[in-house]
Amino acid sequence: MKQLTEKQIVDNWNKLMQLIENTFEGDRLKKLKTMYTYFEDRMSIAPASGKAAYHNAMVGGYVEHVLHVTDCALKIKKLWEEDGAMINFTDEELIFAAMHHDLG
């Protein structure tokens, strides 16, 4: 099973916080920063899955998974645009959905 180093976990958390800072603004930015700061100690080390056979089921796997999903979502959107698809959502909406697709 893949394992992340402490540095990778910290780097991933910092990338996630930078993504939030660069994507959102206003009240949404403030609320997201408040939520993620409050849960940092748990979210930064949480696995993406509790089952060892599933994706990113290691310490720090949740944040790594979220970063992969947001990156893939943006790449797929770009492919759709290049194919002439009508895009009726913003990058902010796409990233918000990608970041939180596993919550709740």
Model segments located where?
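Acidic/His-rich, divalent-metal-binding segments that scaffold phosphate/diphosphate chemistry
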Residues: 1-104
